[in-house]
Amino acid sequence: MINREDLLKNPVEDITLSDLKKYNDIVSVFDKIYGFSSEGIVNGSKILKEMIKNADLRFLSFTANLVSTGLRGLFADLIKKGYFNIVVTTGGTIDHDLARSFGGVYYKGSFDIDDTMLKDLEIHRLGNVLVPFESYGKVIEDVVRKFLPEITKDRKEISAYELLWEFGKRITDSNSILRAAYDKNVPIIVPGILDGSFGTNLFIQSQFLNFRINLFEDMRLIKDLIFSSKKSGALIIGGGISKHHTIWWNQFKDGLNYAIYITTAQEYDGSLSGAKPREAISWNKIRPDAKHVTIYGDATIIVPILAASLLS
C-alpha cells in the first residue's frame, strides 16, 4: 500500500489575475484557430467584456467542486477587482473556503487512486484533488463552534448572506472568497446552504444557541437587486442549484441581458445543468435579444482563459 506521506506531497495552489497577465492576449490565438470549441471561447470573452462594461448587476455563479482547486483564488480576485457584484453558489463552496482559510491543505492527486485505500488512509478524493480528513470536517466544525456564538450573541435572526459576511470578516487569507465578498460588500447567495459540513454544523449549534437563519431575507435581497438593475448578466459555471437560482430570479424582470454558460453537461436528458440559454429564453429567464453563449469544457481550463482576456 502507498504511504500517506507519498500522496500528500504537492498542495493545490490558488491563482490570481496577476498569474494570468502574460496570457492576456490568448483569446486572439483562439480567434485565429476559430474552429469548433475555440469559437465559444472567443464569443464568451466578447460577451463577458461587454457584460462587465454595460451590466450594473453581474452574477458570478459556480459550483463548489471548483473551490477545491486553484480557481478559488481567481474567484476571490474577480470579486476584489469588482468584475462581479453578486455570487450564487452551493453549500460546499463555504466548506472548502473555510477549510482552506483556516489551515486545511488540499493536494494534487489522481482520478485513478484506489478509493478504499484512500479511506483507510483517511483521505477524501474530489476528482483528482485529495483532501485529508484533518483538512476538512474538523476544521469547519472548529471554525463554526468558535465564531458562531459571538456572531449570534446579539442577533438571534440573521440572513444567510450576512452570516457569510460575518465569517468572511474573521478570515485573513487573501485568497478567500468569503473574505473578498465581505471586503467588497458582495452578497454570496447559497440557496442550499444546509447541504454540506457548514450547514450541518449550523444545525448542530442551533440546538445550543438561540438563533435562526432567515433565508427569505436572501430572497428579498436578490429580488431587490434584480428589480433595481438596468441590465443584468451572468457568468454561470456548472449547473445545479447555483445555475437555476441565478436564472430563476432574473425571469421576473424579463431575463438576463447577458449569459455565459461553461459546462460539460448535455441537453439530451432534459437536465437543468445541460440546458442551453435558448431553453431559458422560453422560460423568460434570458431575454430573446440577450447575448449568450455556451462553452463546453472543463472550467479549470476555460475560466482562466476568460479571466486573462479581461486584462487585455
Curated annotation (Swiss-Prot):
EC numbers on record: 2.5.1.46
Signal peptide: none
Required co-factors: NAD(+)
Molecular function terms from GO: deoxyhypusine synthase activity
Record keyword Transferase present: yes
Entry's Gene Ontology cellular component terms: cytoplasm
Pathway(s) served: Protein modification; eIF5A hypusination
Residues forming the catalytic site: K285 (nucleophile)
Similarity annotation: Belongs to the deoxyhypusine synthase family.
Main function: Catalyzes the NAD-dependent oxidative cleavage of spermidine and the subsequent transfer of the butylamine moiety of spermidine to the epsilon-amino group of a specific lysine residue of the eIF-5A precursor protein to form the intermediate deoxyhypusine residue.
Protein name stated in the entry: Probable deoxyhypusine synthase
Organism: Saccharolobus solfataricus (strain ATCC 35092 / DSM 1617 / JCM 11322 / P2) (Sulfolobus solfataricus)
